[in-house]
From Swiss-Prot:
The lineage of its organism: Bacteria, Pseudomonadati, Pseudomonadota, Alphaproteobacteria, Rhodobacterales. This is Electron transfer flavoprotein-ubiquinone oxidoreductase. Keywords: 4Fe-4S, Electron transport, FAD, Flavoprotein, Iron, Iron-sulfur, Metal-binding, Oxidoreductase, Transport, Ubiquinone. Binds 1 [4Fe-4S] cluster. FAD binds at residues 11-25. Monomer. InterPro entries: FAD/NAD-bd_sf. It is an enzyme of class 1 (oxidoreductase). GO terms for molecular function: 4 iron, 4 sulfur cluster binding; electron-transferring-flavoprotein dehydrogenase activity; metal ion binding. Accepts electrons from ETF and reduces ubiquinone. Its cofactor is [4Fe-4S] cluster; FAD. It comes from Paracoccus denitrificans.
Amino acid sequence: SDIGGSMDYDVVIVGAGGAGLSAAILKQVNP
């Protein structure tokens, strides 16, 4: 249960980080 929760948490963090990174790249490409 704890391991599954940690995995879900990591996935959320990675997903949020990826979205933020994509947004930052788009802003640089199209300022």
